[in-house]
Amino acid sequence: MRETNGKNSGSVSPHAWRQETEGTFTAEHGSEAGRSPAGEWPTAGWSTAEPERMGMDSGMLADTIRAFRDRGVRSLVVVRAGMLVAEAYGAGLQPGTPQDVRSVTKSIVSMLAGAALADGRLRSVEQRISDFYPELKNDPKTSQLRIKHLLSMTSGLAWNNAGDQSSIEMMHSEDWVQYILERPAIHMPGRVSTYSNGDAHLLSAVLQQAVGMPLADYAQARLFGPLGITDYRWNADPQGIAIGAWAMALTPRDMAKLGWLYLKGGEWDGARVLPKKWVRESLQRRIVHHYKDGRKGGYGYYWWLKPLVPGLTGGDSSKPSPKLEAFYAAGSGGQRIFVIPALELVAAFTAESPDGEMPEELLNGIVRSIRSETPLQANPEAACRLTQAVSSFKAQPQNV
């Protein structure tokens, strides 16, 4: 196991961000449209840049980090246009410390489903689960269960989230997959959405059968290896099946790598890690989700989708504020990988907070620090404040 590094590998020239077709975003660098700044591909570690060089205000970032120091945040990493501009870690944590990301694991399972499709290990998302578990053919409901239903949590299998009852029962069972398969089918697949750790773990079991090896090994070969991710853990159930609903630990820098891969449409350093088509499909809204603040978002294939509060970014007030759409991986307690393609921004958080609104509030503070699409003038005083805020954050006791 090695610790990734964030050494600065070079300077960053002025560049402007532009939206490309089909929802992918690249950068313009000099006179060569589409060329991105140095450090875009952080396989060996993120290159760093002062926030001002990436159009961000160090002082505002410092204020945000200080404001959230006492709100249960354990660590945060901020990347813009392929450059690490800020990171902070609580006491006892280092950049190379893998942390429990909980249900962020589900989004990674979605990525692996895309890889399995690309490799021909799965025929399509229309493939029936009974191809892998023939006993499902005996029920008229479960006989119609397909991979797409597990990915969108519309299996129709009963799952009780009150007090995590079904998840706890599954964990106490001798065979987790058998527990899931024995759940009563209360809806036809595709009709009703129920957040289900059972659906995610059953998909992991299906993938493990499809690829013919432990899913953690497949993840290393097809996803983590190409991205240079080596410091991670992924626990398995009693039968050796990687737990699809939670149980992965990653470093925040590596969480940001996964977000960057998706921002780039599945491409990594000139290689196609995931099909662009899969990235688009997994981010397509399958389920409408109404947030508490009234905004309408959704759920794709284990990815959450949400429009952000308008008017967050600074800059030229004579120009209309861009409509910002985010997609993100989420785990309980505040684990997040946020991606905002229009800003070429990735933010990864780990936390232990009961406040469900905290992660987006932290993200909003980061977005507000974006003042320009071109570099700002260097601000040594603000840079000093940011350094102090990071040091103060590290001094804050954390429940690790």
Identify the residue ranges that each predicted region occupies.
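Solvent-exposed loop and edge beta-strand segments that line ligand/cofactor-binding
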Residues: Q99, D139-K141, M188-Y195, I243-A249, ...
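Active-site SXXK
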Residues: G82, Q99-V125, L150, L203-L207, ...
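Active-site helix/loop module of the DD-peptidase/beta-lactamase fold
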Residues: D100, D119-L157, E182, V211-W246, ...
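Active-site Gly/Thr loop motif
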Residues: I229-D231, Q284-V346
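Flexible glycine/proline-enriched surface loops and loop-helix/loop-strand junctions
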Residues: Q94, R183-P189, D199-H201, D237-G244, ...
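Active-site-proximal alpha-helical segments within enzyme catalytic domains
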Residues: D199-V206, W246-E267, Q335-E352
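Structured C-terminal helix/loop/strand segments within mature extracytoplasmic catalytic/sensor domains
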Residues: S13, W17, A326-N399
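N-terminal leader/targeting segments and the immediately adjacent pre-domain N-terminus
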Residues: M1-Q99, L117-R123, S152, T374-V400
